[in-house]
Amino acid sequence: KEQIKKLITIFPEGQVVIIVDDKIVGCALSIIVNYNMVKGDHTYAQVTGNETFNTHDPNGNILYGIEVFIHPDYRGLRLARRMYEYRKELCEKLNLKAIMFGGRIPNYHKYADKMRPKEYIEHVRNREIYDPVLTFQLSNDFHVRRVIRNYLPSDEESEHCATLLQWDNIYYQPPTDSYVDRKPTVRIGLVQWQM
């Protein structure tokens, strides 16, 4: 509860909650980070600053998904999809480059003795294997950038693996330097003749 309050304080528009009959039935939490922080291997603890969220950078260029949950009684109503649509709209509105997050692969433990994570992801992508998390993410236009090991050390179902997922904002406009900010490069060549 305290963590959600902090997120609402530092980045209110990044937090979305679905309430039905005065009961929270779903939420999506996110922060803004710089791409360099999350492009390679990282853990949930690192990206969240051990859940202090001091890693939130309003000047960053990535909307990073911290958590999404839907109460079991309300699954199948496309509520998670609506929250993801909100995140995409927010990403476009804030002119952020992409949405990224570490996604669990909870059915991987059933296949870990037969295939590596890369093969498992391919089977899920080809709809030969169903994974409740990854199948949903792929159907929402996210793509797998890489496998992250030990993203959530306690996630035994995923065999301590996660997928780094990304959705690219096709409307993203990189910031342009103003004329004042430019530092021109001047090259001077000198030749000295001895006579």
Predicted regions and their residues:
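Conserved acyl-donor/pantetheine-binding loop and adjacent beta-alpha core of acyl/acetyltransferases
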Residues: 28-67, 82-85, 104-132, 138, ...
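Conserved acetyl-CoA-binding loop-helix of GNAT-fold acetyltransferases
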Residues: 70, 76-92, 98-101
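Glycine-rich phosphate/pyrophosphate-binding loop shared by adenosine-nucleotide-utilizing enzymes
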Residues: 23-27, 63, 186
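Conserved beta-hairpin
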Residues: 14-28, 43-44
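Hydrophobic structural segments
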Residues: 176-195
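C-terminal/domain-terminus segments
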Residues: 1, 82-90, 146-176
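Short loop/turn motifs at secondary-structure junctions and domain boundaries
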Residues: 6-11
